Amino acid sequence: MSVKNILFIDSYYNSLYGAQKSMINLALQLQEKNINVTIASMHSGFLLEEARNNSINTYSFNFNPNILKSEHQYSGLYQKITFIFLLFFSWIRAFILHFHKLKTSDVICVNDIRTFLYLFPLLMLTRKKNIW
């Protein structure tokens, strides 16, 4: 199987640290080898802006910002229940709006554990090669 479309996904949409910079550098090198690369994130932010500045295709899943909060903000029982409901409805919304984007990629590279959690059902349904 010849890889033609690679989708990189990272949930840290407003970060440009080591992992995100490495992902952008790898995407640029793959583009030089005529591989179609897209960098996606859970929401628009610095990561997608930097990818666009480097002429890399971008895609935003536009997840609810409340679900993208850090773990310590879900310390109480109410917050944990809210998170579970938000996650469930985000899965449904992502399936309806974004499943096609995942399905058209030959390889899906997940850059962090949060992304894997946020997109777990969709990643399994695509039956595509998933790299973490």
Predicted segments — roles?
Residues S2-L7:
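Extreme N-terminal starter segment of soluble prokaryotic enzymes
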Residues D10-I24, I113:
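A short, glycine/small-residue-rich beta-strand->loop->alpha-helix junction that serves as a flexible
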Residues D10-L16, Q29, K33-I84:
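N-terminal strand-loop element at the rim of the active site
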Residues I24-L28, E32, P121:
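Short, well-ordered alpha-helices that flank and scaffold nucleotide-derived cofactor binding pockets
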Residues G45-L48, T115-L119:
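Short, well-ordered alpha-helical microsegments
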Residues S90-W91, V110-F116:
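Short His-centered aromatic/hydrophobic patch
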Residues A94-T104:
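Short, well-structured alpha-helical segments in soluble
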Residues V107-D112, L123-W132:
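Active-site proximal beta-strand in glycosyltransferases
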